[in-house]
Amino acid sequence: TAALAGYILEDDLEASLRYLAEINEAGFNLVQLNKDLIHYLRRVLALKFDPQLEEVFKRELTPDEITEIKKHLSLVKDPNKVIDLIKSLIRAYSEMRYSPFTLVPLEIAIIENLKG
């Protein structure tokens, strides 16, 4: 999840799509991946607006996970873009749960938010 979040926050559409294709091919649960991605990006965004939340996150995350989130935090130049992305991922999550093509809504959400 952190790897995909990094690609997305770096606006690297090709790496994001490649990662999704590999995860899908390996048989991972894409609905769960999207759910985890939403939670991860929410934490990054929350920490951007309130650095004191790090103390709360320390209770539920490992030190390595906190370090990774802080690294990704530095990539957030426009918080509104991340907010829009999270909204798109939530919509995709709803669509994915009932679709025979679970990859498509997730790919579309990422493409819509990262396309030049």
Where are these regions (language model features)?
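Extended, largely alpha-helical regulatory/partner-binding modules appended to the mid-to-C-terminal parts
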Residues: 1-116
